[in-house]
């Protein structure tokens, strides 16, 4: 390439670079939205998966995806949920109250007083 052509390209590049009138605004990248409420999938220490979706609750095994329990839930407050469910294993109905301890942990108590925790599934 001829020296004159190189000089012309460099001058053109410099002229174009100087056309910007203001520095570009750099916006911080937002991270993935934090999950709110109980919507989504949760897992217990035994690997059983519970799903909350639009007022419907279900619990399934992870290996065969067998339905163990199903029912409905109501958000009593932003951090409290009440589940009315039927156990398909025991053929019993029960009420469970759960408190959202953290966005990733749900602490629950059955109507018989048994307590358990669920962890949000990533």
UniProtKB/Swiss-Prot annotation:
A lipid is attached at residue 19 (N-palmitoyl cysteine). Keywords: Cell outer membrane, Lipoprotein, Membrane, Palmitate, Signal. It comes from the Bacteria. Its main location: membrane. The keyword Ribonucleoprotein does not apply. GO terms for cellular component: cell outer membrane. Residues 1-18 form the signal peptide. InterPro entries: Omp10-like. Belongs to the rhizobiaceae omp10 lipoprotein family. This is Outer membrane lipoprotein omp10 homolog. It comes from Rhizobium meliloti (strain 1021).
């Amino acid at each position: 390439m001829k020296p004159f052509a190189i000089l012309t390209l460099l001058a053109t590049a410099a002229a174009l670079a100087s056309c910007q009138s203001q520095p570009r605004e750099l916006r911080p990248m937002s991270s993935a939205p934090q999950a709110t409420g109980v919507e989504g999938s949760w897992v217990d220490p035994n690997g059983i998966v519970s799903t909350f979706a639009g007022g419907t609750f279900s619990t399934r095994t992870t290996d065969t995806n067998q339905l163990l329990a199903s029912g409905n839930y109501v958000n009593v407050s932003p951090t409290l949920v009440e589940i009315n469910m039927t156990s398909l294993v025991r053929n019993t109905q029960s009420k469970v109250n759960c408190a959202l301890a953290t966005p990733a942990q749900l602490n629950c108590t059955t109507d018989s007083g048994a307590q358990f925790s669920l962890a949000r599934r990533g």
